[in-house]
Amino acid sequence: MNYNQPATLQAAILDWAGTVVDFGSFAPTQIFVEAFAEFGVQVSLEEARGPMGMGKWDHIRTLCDIPAIAERYRAVFGRLPSDDDVTAIYERFMPLQIEKIAEHSALIPGALQAIAELRGMGLKIGSCSGYPAVVMEKVVALAETNGYVADHVVATDEVPNGRPWPAQALANVIALGIDDVAACVKVDDTWPGILEGRRAGMWTVALTCSGNALGLTYEQYKALPAAELERERTRIEQMFEGSRPHYLIETIAELPAVVRDINARLARGEMPQGN
């Protein structure tokens, strides 16, 4: 039996916050700030956004490893934060996140139309998130009331290793019955999510304006002067360089055009691993 590379995409694997819901990815960011504050440790929104895309325990561990934050913790507790301390912050983070997730549950403008267009091209819709399953249950239910239902959902605690490991993306491949990772495109607003897709052998699309990197509401994004938006796009594109996305677009609304381009490249014999 011979290997035949895929002729078209079979699935899009979409992130959630900052990709399909919660323009600006505010739900997790603000809660990190509040969770640390309950322990008397100040963390800025900008600092909290840094590791976005990782599982939430790993995100907190990464924040605690930042020297400035570690020193703030030491000033309060007389020691550097241990894994047990990270777990204590995480256990405070979780109920806050569940309580407030609905405040940032709106679908990103253009998402439903783009996803419908992908389905019309024959793609299945997988999804994964840095949220654990207990939070994803609520996120999924809220999205369903707004008209979005993915074909499969993988939470960060449903695999041995979250992003930037490829496990969540690959779990979607298995569950959706996709026969080749090169027939998948991973879409995300964070570098760990792009690395996840890259390591899974997929096409990758980074979102520059709807998520964590820009960190603005939709209204603020639309109101940005053209010159400032261009500067921000340049900054964000540089941030993504290390993870090597195949495409960079502003929001999911532009995704159908990218899928058509990937299909054309597959038809020419191109593969994601070779680019």
From Swiss-Prot:
Reactions catalysed according to its record: phosphonoacetaldehyde + H2O = acetaldehyde + phosphate + H(+)
EC number: 3.11.1.1
One GO location term (cellular component): cytosol
Active site: D15, K56
GO biological process, one term: organic phosphonate catabolic process
Entry keyword Transcription regulation: no
GO molecular function per UniProt: magnesium ion binding; phosphoglycolate phosphatase activity; phosphonoacetaldehyde hydrolase activity
CC cofactor: Mg(2+)
Similarity-based family: Belongs to the HAD-like hydrolase superfamily. PhnX family.
Function: Involved in phosphonate degradation.
Protein name: Phosphonoacetaldehyde hydrolase
Protein's organism: Pseudomonas aeruginosa (strain UCBPP-PA14)
Lineage, broadest ranks: Bacteria, Pseudomonadati, Pseudomonadota, Gammaproteobacteria, Pseudomonadales
Gene of this entry: phnX
